[in-house]
């Protein structure tokens, strides 16, 4: 991701295009809970977000103080048009409607590159720091994050690098995830060894059966 300055405007080149954002935008809409978590940690207020399936630790955003802008999969375009946001932050779930969102306000695509998970997360955090003039807070945030990762990796190493298997259960479907996947940080960042080195890399994981688990 490339960030350039034009006066008080940041020009951010991302995977889907270009976002021209005024520094410290006031009306911010977030469609990614990872980005919301980061903004919350940096003390950046947001105007709106999807209020379905909000993680428990971000439950305060269920408050009426925040506008409901639809769901992660189905943005409420009418509400967004009404809000006239200064910045819309999205990730992979909204990729297909990027063009429509970008007509309603500068839209920044902050997806994670699972093949380089940790570095990708840090880059996204630093971009948010640039937008909201929170560079110092970002340095502290990332230092704390790196310390926590190092502490977990030390425990993993001390345990003899144990194996792990990450699965997702959705109705009757069970999917396994390996390195370089959406849950690949368990292996690539925290240092666990995948119990099955042949798990195929897929956005939705590799379909498995109960027999596979046995």
Descriptions of predicted regions:
Residues 29-32, 73, 91-94, 114-121, ...:
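Solvent-exposed, acidic/flexible segments
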Residues 1-33, 136-165:
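Bacterial Sec-exported substrate-binding components of ABC uptake systems
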Residues 97-171:
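Extracytoplasmic substrate-binding proteins
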Residues 13-20, 60, 106-109, 126:
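Acidic/histidine-rich, surface-exposed loop or edge segments in extracytoplasmic proteins
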């Amino acid at each position: 991701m490339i960030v350039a300055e034009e006066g008080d405007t940041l020009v951010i080149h991302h995977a889907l295009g270009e976002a021209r954002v005024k520094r410290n935008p006031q009306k911010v809409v977030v469609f990614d809970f990872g980005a919301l978590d980061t903004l919350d940690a940096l003390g950046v207020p947001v105007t709106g977000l999807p209020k379905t399936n909000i993680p428990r630790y971000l439950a305060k955003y269920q408050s009426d103080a925040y506008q409901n802008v639809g769901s992660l999969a189905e943005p409420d375009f009418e509400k967004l048009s009404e809000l006239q946001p200064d910045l819309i932050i999205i990730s992979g779930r909204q990729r297909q409607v990027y063009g429509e969102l970008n007509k309603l306000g500068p839209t920044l695509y902050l997806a994670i590159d699972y093949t380089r998970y940790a570095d990708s997360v840090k880059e996204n955090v630093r971009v948010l720091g640039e937008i909201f003039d929170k560079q110092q807070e970002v340095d502290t945030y990332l230092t704390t994050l790196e310390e926590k990762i190092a502490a977990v990796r030390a425990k993993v190493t001390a345990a003899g690098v144990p194996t792990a298997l990450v699965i997702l259960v959705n109705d009757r479907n069970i999917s396994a995830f390996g390195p370089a996947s959406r849950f690949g940080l368990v292996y690539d960042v925290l240092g666990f060894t995948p119990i099955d080195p042949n798990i195929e890399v897929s956005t939705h994981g590799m379909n498995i059966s109960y027999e596979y688990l046995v």
